[in-house]
Amino acid sequence: MISIVNGTSTLSLVAGSVETLNQAINFYTNILGLSVHSEQNDWTYLSNDDNKMIVKIQLDTKSGLSLDQVNDRRTEIIAKLNVTDWRSLDTTSVLKVQNLVALIETLTTFNYTLQITPNELYPNEVYCVGPIGYIIGFTACDEPLTLVPPLQKSHPKPGLVSNLMSKSGSQSRNIEETKAVRRNIAVMTSGGDSQGMNAAVRAVVRATIFHGSKAFAVQEGYAGLVKGGPEYIKEMKWQDVRGFLSEGGTNIGTARCMEFKERWGRLKGCKNLIDAGIDGLIVCGGDGSLTGADLFRHEWPSLIQELKDKGEITNEQFERHKHLYICGMVGSIDNDMAMTDATIGGYSALERICRAIDYIDATANSHSRAFVVEVMGRHCGWLALMAGIATSADYIFIPEKPASSKDWQDQMCDIVGKHRAQGKRKTIVIVAEGAITSDLKPITSDEVKDVLVDRLGLDTRITVLGHVQRGGTAVAFDRTLATLQGVEAVKAILELTPDVPSPLIAIDENKICRRPLVEAVRITKSVASAIEAKDFEKAMSLRDHEFKEHLANFMAMNTANHEKPTLPREKRKKIAIINIGAPAGGMNSAVYAMATYCMSRGHTPYAIHNGFAGLSRHESVKSIEWIDIEGWNSIGGSEIGTNRQTPEETDIGMIAHYFEKYQFDGLIIVGGFEAFVSLEQLERSRAMYPSFRIPMVLIPATISNNVPGTEYSLGADTCLNSLMEYCDIVKQSASATRGTAFIIDVQGGNSGYIATFASLISGAQASYVPEEGISLQQLEMDINSLREAFAVEQGMTKSGKLIIKSSNASKVLTPHTLADIFNDECHGDFDTKTAIPGHVQQGGLPSPIDRSRGDRFAIRAVQFIEDHCDVLAPYRYELDFPIDDKKILNTAAVLGIKSSRLRFTSIRHLFDFETELGRRMPKTIYWNTIRDISDQLVGRTRLDKP
């Protein structure tokens, strides 16, 4: 039933021609369901069924608009679709309808352009240009002024490509959200491409739509901004970015643009953004691209004033676009931006380098050859440094730490020669493309090769990786980073005010944060300036702390027992390392780093093989020799063996006996929750067993990431990369067969970490985790969501769907049971299958992140033991042991990342106050916000837990 919102019963209209009159009659009868009541002279009367509403249309060629005038007016109004609220353009008539969603679908079928508020999924009002040139609106509201409009959720039909978006039940829409700031936001990729840019574009587009704003993409970087028009500044719909997550490069294009460096080019860009109605611009690129973006914002007031003075924009446009809001995301494989730990694409490029060197290792070892590997990095040696750490390279050349023209040859030959003398068959030297001597002379790969051949007589080859480093899909970390930063960038644009400087979205350890864009770019550029000025100490000081820490670690590990130890003999210790729990990527890296760092310091490293069971039953203790662990950094699993038994489950007294026999001064445990429990048992037994009165550190290593005291565990990244590749392949199969969804069962115990992040990086339609369980109501909503999604994407490519289920989310609803339920309840709209990756999730070769973090954590653990030995030494054999002394308690700790810091936390505090022992979980988890974002970006509604 249709009526007028303000309560009046009659609507009077004027048609300027017979054609427009007939169009109006067809509109009100065929679309709105009115019927022709009568015709008198030039008047036509239409009414609804109970005659409570009358529409009178008069044919008047003088006062009404002709067909051409109607078309011109329609074109003029539609041009302002993304710029102006149509309600402000003219007096509008608003009709009340019972089913607004159905009317929207009907109007769309008849090719009417609609302006919908607040958005297409939850429409309150919809406006279109009627057949005789009037703006007409429709609503489900009973009153013209209402504080709580009735929200009807859209259910898309086949062929109706809608801007699907949804919000989790925990963040359901309310009246406050409808008052939020809405801005038209454009995203642009610029400069060199990097893996993860597509994930960033997808996140920006969908987060923008989710917040009720309009999303745009600037094609071809700044070149597209200068050229402008709908071809280069294109409105993006929800479905336009499907499949972006698994694709490398940038699908919206990038180009270097000299025109934008000139003011006239930026003036054209300003005009084009205003024409498109853009309020905010998110730029993903390197320091040059971000510098241009900030300059653009700085000049914006003068640019828009110039356009107004020239008459190229109206006063209304000038007032509407007085301010441009800009936010930066760093897309660069060099990872050379200051004030952020990682850039989008950096770890993907590092993965390509490490994978290539892993392959090269095999042939180098076979022929006892040396390989010189050239990697990218003109002014930043991050790729070369991290690759050197992750692959145990013999030598690296980076621009931040040059040597004199002769010194580098002597240093390299000295280290490589000693490695060869120790029995190493292969040699890997990594050269950053920007490597230089202290007098700024470039060091080329050919020069390095010649030195290795002439001075050491090594059969040497050169491998230049080139653009292979940019290619391929993004790794799990870069997909996560790009997605979270894209969502944060949209929030930043919506929250910015004219007096707030442009932000740069950064990451600090494990936390997404905002930094001043101008300051970050300034520091980044000053590094290159310092190098050019030969001020290498300043250049190194401008790098972040983690870079300097990694460089110091590499130099220490690289010398190992080949140089004089750095500690005096009286301070050298015996330090043991043991693996507990299931194998995880990075365990071997931790053993390698611990052993080599101990050797460089003068300590004696020991490996306890096969866990505490191996120690108590077989006395499986062995000192570590350098040549025995050569290459372990790149090997998956656990070379020293591992099992799940804790000290109390084996024989804690026998373990104490062997600790005393070997006179261990420190212990490093690498493992998951069993390792956590083991450390607690050892710490609790100190009063009874003096041999446990030594510093002890746990390095969390488990794919479940369920160890209290840390937000990241070794092995989790390797697991996510393996699972990501698996999901991409399964999704490809689902897309190829059309109308297919796969339920993928993943590990993780009682932790939903793996399922949550796998859902985020694969674009899964839903994920089920133990923390929430699976309710029938949620299943029903997810099935309906899948039906809607398949309806919208009917006939489209890249339309395969995934559902991620953690094994312990439900013991009753197994993957096969879930698949049967989905197939039965979907009424044939799609087909559901299962896929179970099993132990494939543990991964093969550890990822570069797990390798480098394993090294970093192990060295920090050794340093912790060095720092705390003196605390326990006075009490080693005292009968009255102060077990509750805080200093004593702090000598048994978990090393972890929490928020944005690397920290040691007492095992006693964690065990007593932050652990759910029965569930083998920490009491608080940090990835709930990740779940919300993952659901938002696929349009899933998640119910609150009761």
From Swiss-Prot:
Binding sites annotated in the UniProt record for beta-D-fructose 2,6-bisphosphate 1: K833
Keywords from the UniProt entry: Allosteric enzyme, ATP-binding, Cytoplasm, Glycolysis, Kinase, Magnesium, Metal-binding, Nucleotide-binding, Transferase
Activity-regulation annotation: Allosterically activated by ADP, AMP, or fructose 2,6-bisphosphate, and allosterically inhibited by ATP or citrate.
Identification of the protein by name: ATP-dependent 6-phosphofructokinase subunit beta
Domain of life (superkingdom): Eukaryota
Protein's UniProt keywords contain Calcium: no
Binding-site positions, beta-D-fructose 2,6-bisphosphate 2: R644, T702, I703, S704, N705, N706, Q747, G748, G749, H839, V840, Q841, Q842, R920
Cellular localisation: Cytoplasm
Keyword Ribonucleoprotein: no
Annotated spans, C-terminal regulatory PFK domain 2: 574-946
GO biological process, one term: vacuolar acidification
Predominant place of localization: cytoplasm
